[in-house]
């Protein structure tokens, strides 16, 4: 008896800062639970985000923008990722950081537009007519060559297909005969033919012939069920950026010159507005015909204060364009100078005319009990065991410094606990790593005390 151990094909992913976030943690009425789906506290912000999710699902939020504003470490990025989790895989979600727009290769506005187009999905529904079955007959019909001479040409191909429900005889175009020869189709093979494109696919040999030979390399497949002629609906999800790239960079030939030409091209090519307008026309035509459906997704721009005045102006135009996604901004700044100017001070570093277009969600600082719950969640995600006094001490450290610093102490404390031969992290382990690794406040205090010892 042979027993094989099956290895999992699921990709192992690193435990990141927001691995524990699984959703917004709302009940059926849309009210936030104290601790659910990886989020703790921030009830008002989560309830507001829940309303936004409902609007996105009902397609009533496209072309509008949202701002998550609050101090550092209050869960702005976590709420944005929770929105993405609630929307699911079918709605495009494109995260980026404000500083990503600055590139030596392409313009700032081009980077923004690329990400805008990445956030807009297109769901294309295509009905394919398929003939599927076991080949019972394959007869090419020859005629005299119309060009004269002694040669003969194939005028059509007669093919018989059988399924569990019945049989059908088809008269096919001579071009399909070449495809049949390429696939090496014989009587007894199970094939399917696409009616629209004429594509032929050999699925394998019918399992009724399985006992024909002792040594056989064939793959045997069962006789197809249902009718010979079937209709299949194929749904394809693409983004507008995928269409832009496919049309901006058509594939070259296979010869050496074209391959060298592709290597010589710059890394990034700007997609022209003219091309985008042409693609929009085709997309609109598909939508009018009912072939395709537009799926407005979410563009999440973190650290929005890193954008400058030119990009903010471009955002006005992009948000008011007919095809626009839902844009979520996040910032941890109060009143500060707008980047790209010298003296214009504005709330969150965003111009007032753009702020006027935004719905603002505020995030508040966590209480000590909330911090303790978050640290427990993180410890559970990372598979660490802590004693209750250790959790209490970490939440105190988080309150006096930042939540991020308290969470970052977990892994070094676990290492310290392993060195001491224990399985549970104690309060002493936390104190040890707290004294070894400084937080920003203690480091700046140390810097101000010993300022004359450092180089200017």
UniProtKB/Swiss-Prot annotation:
Kindly state which keywords UniProt assigns to this record, in alphabetical order. Answer: Activator, ATP-binding, Cell cycle, Cell division, Chromatin regulator, DNA damage, DNA recombination, DNA repair, Helicase, Hydrolase, Nucleotide-binding, Nucleus, Transcription, Transcription regulation
What is any one of the record's Gene Ontology cellular component terms?
nucleus
Q: Name one GO molecular function term.
A: ATP hydrolysis activity
Q: What is its EC number?
A: 3.6.4.12
- What Gene3D superfamilies does the entry give? 1.10.8.60, P-loop containing nucleotide triphosphate hydrolases, RuvB-like helicase, domain II
Is Oxidoreductase included in the keywords of this UniProt record? no
Q: Which Pfam families match?
A: TIP49, TIP49_C
**InterPro entries in alphabetical order:** AAA+_ATPase, P-loop_NTPase, RuvB-like, RuvB-like_C, RuvBL1/2_DNA/RNA_bd_dom, TIP49_P-loop
Protein residues bound to ATP: 70-77
GO BP annotations listed: cell division; chromatin organization; DNA recombination; DNA repair; positive regulation of canonical Wnt signaling pathway; regulation of cell population proliferation
SUPFAM superfamilies from the UniProt entry = P-loop containing nucleoside triphosphate hydrolases (SSF52540)
Which reaction(s) does the protein catalyse, per the Swiss-Prot or TrEMBL entry? ATP + H2O = ADP + phosphate + H(+)
Per the record, the similarity remark reads: Belongs to the RuvB family.
What is annotated about its quaternary structure and interactions?
Answer: Forms homohexameric rings. May form a dodecamer with rept made of two stacked hexameric rings. Component of the chromatin remodeling Ino80 complex.
Functionally, this protein is described as follows:
Acts as a transcriptional coactivator in Wg signaling caused by altered arm signaling. Pont and rept interfere antagonistically with nuclear arm signaling function, and are required to enhance or reduce arm activity, respectively. Also an essential cofactor for the normal function of Myc; required for cellular proliferation and growth. Proposed core component of the chromatin remodeling Ino80 complex which is involved in transcriptional regulation, DNA replication and probably DNA repair.
Protein name (Swiss-Prot/TrEMBL): RuvB-like helicase 1
């Amino acid at each position: 008896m042979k027993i094989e151990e099956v290895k999992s094909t699921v990709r192992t992913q690193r435990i990141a800062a927001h691995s524990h976030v699984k959703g917004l943690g709302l009940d059926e009425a849309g009210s936030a639970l104290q601790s659910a789906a990886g989020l703790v506290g921030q009830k008002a912000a989560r309830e507001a985000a829940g309303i936004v999710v409902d609007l996105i699902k009902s397609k009533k939020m496209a072309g509008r923008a949202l701002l998550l504003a609050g101090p550092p470490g209050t869960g702005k990025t976590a709420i944005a990722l929770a929105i993405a989790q609630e929307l699911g895989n079918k709605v495009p979600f494109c995260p980026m950081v404000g500083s990503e727009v600055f590139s030596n290769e392409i313009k700032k506005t081009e980077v923004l537009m690329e990400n805008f187009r990445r956030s807009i999905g297109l769901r294309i529904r295509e009905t394919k007519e398929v003939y599927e079955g076991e080949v019972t007959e394959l007869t090419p019909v020859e005629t005299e060559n119309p060009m004269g001479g002694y040669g003969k040409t194939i005028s059509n191909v007669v093919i018989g297909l059988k399924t569990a429900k019945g049989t059908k005889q088809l008269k096919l175009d001579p071009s399909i005969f070449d495809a049949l020869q390429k696939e090496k189709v014989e009587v007894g093979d199970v094939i399917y033919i696409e009616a629209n494109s004429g594509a032929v696919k050999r699925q394998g040999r019918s399992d009724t012939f399985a006992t024909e030979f002792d040594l056989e390399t064939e793959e045997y497949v069962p006789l197809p069920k249902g009718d010979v002629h079937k209709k299949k609906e194929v749904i394809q999800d693409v983004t507008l950026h995928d269409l832009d790239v496919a049309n901006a960079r058509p594939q070259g030939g296979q010869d050496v010159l074209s391959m060298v030409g592709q290597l010589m091209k710059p890394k990034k090519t700007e997609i022209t507005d003219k091309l985008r307008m042409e693609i929009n026309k085709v997309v609109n035509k598909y939508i009018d015909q009912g072939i395709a459906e537009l799926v407005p997704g979410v563009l999440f721009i973190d650290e929005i204060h890193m954008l400058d005045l030119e990009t903010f102006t471009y955002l006005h135009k992009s948000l008011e364009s007919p095809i626009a996604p839902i844009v979520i901004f996040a910032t941890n700044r109060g009143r500060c100078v707008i980047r790209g100017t010298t003296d214009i001070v504005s709330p969150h570093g965003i111009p007032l005319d753009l702020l006027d277009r935004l719905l603002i969600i505020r995030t508040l600082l966590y209480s000590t009990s909330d911090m303790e719950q978050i640290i427990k969640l993180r410890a559970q995600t990372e598979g660490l065991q802590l004693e209750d006094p250790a959790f209490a001490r970490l939440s105190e450290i988080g309150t006096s410094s930042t939540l991020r610093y308290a969470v970052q102490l977990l892994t070094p404390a676990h290492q310290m606990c392993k060195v001491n031969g224990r399985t549970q992290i104690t309060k002493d382990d936390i104190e040890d790593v707290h004294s070894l690794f400084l937080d920003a406040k203690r480091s700046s205090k140390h810097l101000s005390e010993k300022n004359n010892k450092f180089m200017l």
